């Protein structure tokens, strides 16, 4: 929260909440996550967070998932050899990194696409990662069943390579934003990324 607060204040108040009304009405919603995919999904559902996220996206209100908060936006997490359903907002599975040393921990460069909102001005910078799992592919999911209004929005994917894995480092589509890295731990580049996101409000 500290990194988000630093970038948002004094323009915005930052509140840690599981209150539905506050989460729905906020200018932007950050969905953090640490630990296991399954535990994160279980905790999110226990407070109705899955519904809040989809309700916000349905209304075109920005959501930013960070680390496991990014991973749960995908269809499945493949930890422990089993597939745990995610929110299904991005097509793809979250899998164990193929590398000699796991977790991937530390600073790394990324490959940003043209026109990225999040990466504007920080395309050549390094970001801080701490993770063992990641999405190896990304494609727009069919969200028509959830009646989301951004099926025609352009998808922009930022990539990172670690070991033998090329994985999704950041994702943008309409009001949905997500990063596998931690912007709040990524010094000035991370602060600028958060400011870029805040500018979409």
Language-model features: locations:
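Structural alpha-helical scaffold elements that stabilize or flank donor/cofactor-binding regions
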Residues: 1, 22-23, 56
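Short, small-residue-biased leader/transition segments that mark boundaries at the very start
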Residues: 2-9
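Structural motif
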Residues: 30-32
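Cysteine-nucleophile active-site neighborhood
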Residues: 35-106
């Amino acid at each position: 929260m500290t990194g988000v607060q630093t970038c948002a204040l004094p323009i915005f108040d930052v509140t840690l909440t599981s209150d539905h009304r506050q989460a729905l009405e906020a200018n932007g919603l950050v969905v953090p996550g640490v630990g296991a995919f399954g535990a994160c999904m279980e905790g999110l559902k226990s407070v109705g967070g899955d519904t809040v996220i989809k309700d916000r996206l349905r209304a075109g209100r920005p959501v930013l998932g960070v680390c496991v908060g990014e991973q749960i936006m995908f269809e499945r997490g493949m930890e422990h050899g089993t597939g745990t359903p995610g929110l299904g907002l991005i097509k793809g599975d979250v899998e164990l990194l193929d590398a000699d040393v796991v977790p991937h921990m530390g600073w790394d460069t990324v490959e940003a696409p043209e026109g990225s909102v999040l990466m504007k001005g920080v395309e050549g910078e390094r970001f801080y990662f701490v993770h063992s799992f990641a999405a190896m592919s990304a494609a727009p999911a069919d969200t028509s069943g959830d009646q989301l209004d951004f099926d025609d929005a352009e998808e922009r994917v930022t990539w990172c390579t670690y070991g033998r894995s090329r994985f999704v480092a950041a994702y943008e589509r309409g009001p949905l934003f997500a990063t596998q890295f931690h912007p709040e731990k990524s010094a000035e580049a991370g602060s600028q990324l958060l400011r870029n996101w805040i500018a979409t409000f």
